[in-house]
Amino acid sequence: KDGYYRVRTPEGYIAWVSESSITPKSATQLEAWQISSKVIVTADFGHAYTQPDEQSLRISDLVMGDILTMLDASNDFVHVSYPDGRIGYINSKLVLPFDKWLGTRRLTAENVIKTAETMMGLPYLWGGTSVKGVDCSGFTKTAFYMNGLVIPRDASQQVLAGQPIDILSGGTLDIKKAIQNLQPGDLLFFASGTDRPPTARVTHVALYLGNGEFIHAAGSVQINSLLPEASNYGALDTRTLIAARRYIGQDDSALQPLAEHPYYNTGKK
């Protein structure tokens, strides 16, 4: 409609996307793509080129998590195709075979936190889910995605998934209880303004690191603390914290392993 497609993303998000950003595929074409050999970009950032030579013309930029069809490979470059038919070459150091990469994903707090910390300092960008910039929920989504789990897109949706963790007493944040009950890898959820009730609309999310610290995209990706005595105490964030959820180890239809997701499943046994 008027130059836009109404689409549903892999996590179920419904939105409008410009026609120039989408290449429609038939069911047969999608199936062919699913069973094709693919690579995933594991480096933060890179480029594809018209020739197996980084001095040749660029086809496009690439960011961590991009998936492309692999045509063939040499020691130094991978020959790839794009959904819109473009052909390019990527330095092999930037990618891994998708099936191999997927087989090595281990959804642990340590791994999710490690991925999150590689994004330290990235600028905040509303709607962002890459090293070009991230918003708060795009940041947490990327940290889990690169470890094999598709989670809801927005903070207000992410707070509805996983196991609730008790961090409140009498409807307000209990720091002692929170520190006792939270585990690294849990998600913290915040409402706009101070002293909001637990039923307030969630507008921000962070990843808990342990020992009172959390990492989040707020201006830039940074680490703050729930503890008033800490040098990186996040006073405003702490006053607006209203909920916490645990994704790791939870069976929830809103949390979809990449290996089982119909959009990513290769169909190979």
List the predicted regions and their residue ranges.
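Extended non-catalytic domains of envelope/secretory-pathway proteins
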Residues: 46-48
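Second-shell loop/turn segments in exported
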Residues: 99-103, 123-131, 195
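Aromatic- and glycine-rich peptidoglycan recognition patches
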Residues: 29, 54-56, 199-269
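Active-site nucleophilic cysteine motif
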Residues: 116, 128-147
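Generic structural signal for buried aliphatic residues
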Residues: 62, 68, 185-188
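Boundary regions of SH3-family modules and the immediately adjacent low-complexity/disordered segments
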Residues: 1, 8-40, 44, 53, ...
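Sec/Tat-exported extracytoplasmic proteins
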Residues: 52, 119-124, 143, 147-151, ...
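...with weaker cross-activation on analogous glycine-rich loops/strands in unrelated enzymes
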Residues: 152-223, 229, 260
